[in-house]
């Protein structure tokens, strides 16, 4: 039986005598809504689920206000896969597929020669971008390598994607040795061994409390209040209009003629459509010109 009270939730926790911290997340509606507006191949759906889980866990462990973008770029059938998340656990995802992809395709078969790009964009402070070659079989292993290289912290990820109670679900756990240097490799290995005994149905179906007890009942674990995850696209009519105004006016006029006087712009992420007729476009141009005169663009 699935305990829906912990669907679309993220929990952080601390092993009090081990100097290791952890996180657990389960994405139900958050994941389903990502897939609803696109007919992605199954292998791409699976990869996006993994990336959503990874981004959620990364955003929680960074503890800052802002955004994290996890992006895969390659020269294979999957040209691009990108997930964005913020400190409120608002997530969105997008993929661009340029050739047929088998349902069982591996990461390497989908991406070809590719890189994993992690962009950290705080509301205040400097941006950071890390680029890692996708030279390991899974996104999980690539991210663990990222933590070793960039943070010098032992990190272990468990990421599972599947179906439970008739619904798509993606879930995962993170263990990381504390950055204060008090943790030992032996403690970390011990907890990692326990975590690896988790079954898919436990990740997908148990409450966080039941899952942590099942895995770590001999440990003292302090669990922090849950965060709710959600699919949230950042698109708007204003942003769509601004994007359209980047086109030459002659091209906009041509589009208006082809579309019988109304241009529709569809968000690539969530599928929302925005419609603009010529009066609306001229109004947007006037507003943009006023802002430019005021030096606000």
From Swiss-Prot:
Localization per Swiss-Prot or TrEMBL: Cytoplasm
A molecular function (GO) term: protein folding chaperone
UniProt keyword list: Chaperone, Cytoplasm, Disulfide bond, Redox-active center, Zinc
GO cellular component terms listed in the entry, alphabetical order: cytoplasm
PTM remark: Under oxidizing conditions two disulfide bonds are formed involving the reactive cysteines. Under reducing conditions zinc is bound to the reactive cysteines and the protein is inactive.
CDD domains from the UniProt entry: Hsp33 (cd00498)
Keyword check for Zinc-finger: no
One GO-annotated biological process of the protein: protein refolding
Highest taxon of source: Bacteria
One Pfam family linked to the record: HSP33
Cystine pairings recorded for this chain: 233-235, 267-270
Family indicated by similarity: Belongs to the HSP33 family.
HAMAP family for the chain: HslO
Protein's recorded name: 33 kDa chaperonin
Underlying gene: hslO
